[in-house]
Amino acid sequence: MSRRHRAEKREINPDPKFGDLVITKFMNAIMFDGKKSVAERIVYGALDVVESKVKSDPVVLFHQALENVAPHIEVRSRRVGGATYQVPVDVRPDRRRALAVRWLITAARGRNETTMINRLAGELMDAANNRGSAVKKREDVHRMAEANRAFSHYRW
């Protein structure tokens, strides 16, 4: 790990359509090879599909989906006297959001709808209703932390 000063956080502009920073971060995570326009088309298309199916504000549903996927606790490996323990620790708010975004995108890419727009829309609606692969991932992480609660005194 570098001993120099910590890198400064870059200023991110809100997305042009909804004016939401989290949606911008989501777009940046979906983006491949710097193709922001493709990522915008996917995210905005998915939010339009969600709006047409649910008949409510897609941004509220998006934030609800992120909140349902974000983990509160996770396990980290800690080496103590030759043994490696999975120690449950709380997740920082910025990491919570980053993990939720990553898991939502991975789950959407793993679905079998025809286009990425439909896959992402389906995963967002499932996550908002506490279903889907991304929510299952969060529950697995929570279950793992619960199973290793005995090692929580190794927390650092």
Curated annotation (Swiss-Prot):
GO terms for molecular function: rRNA binding; structural constituent of ribosome; tRNA binding. Keywords: Ribonucleoprotein, Ribosomal protein, RNA-binding, rRNA-binding, tRNA-binding. InterPro entries: Ribosomal_uS7 (IPR000235), Ribosomal_uS7_bac/org-type (IPR005717), Ribosomal_uS7_CS (IPR020606), Ribosomal_uS7_dom (IPR023798), Ribosomal_uS7_dom_sf (IPR036823). Coiled coil: none annotated. GO terms for biological process: translation. The keyword Transmembrane helix does not apply. One of its GO terms (cellular component) is small ribosomal subunit. CDD domains: uS7_Bacteria (cd14869). Part of the 30S ribosomal subunit. Contacts proteins S9 and S11. One of the primary rRNA binding proteins, it binds directly to 16S rRNA where it nucleates assembly of the head domain of the 30S subunit. Is located at the subunit interface close to the decoding center, probably blocks exit of the E-site tRNA. Belongs to the universal ribosomal protein uS7 family. This is Small ribosomal subunit protein uS7. It comes from Bartonella quintana (strain Toulouse). The lineage of its organism: Bacteria, Pseudomonadati, Pseudomonadota, Alphaproteobacteria, Hyphomicrobiales.
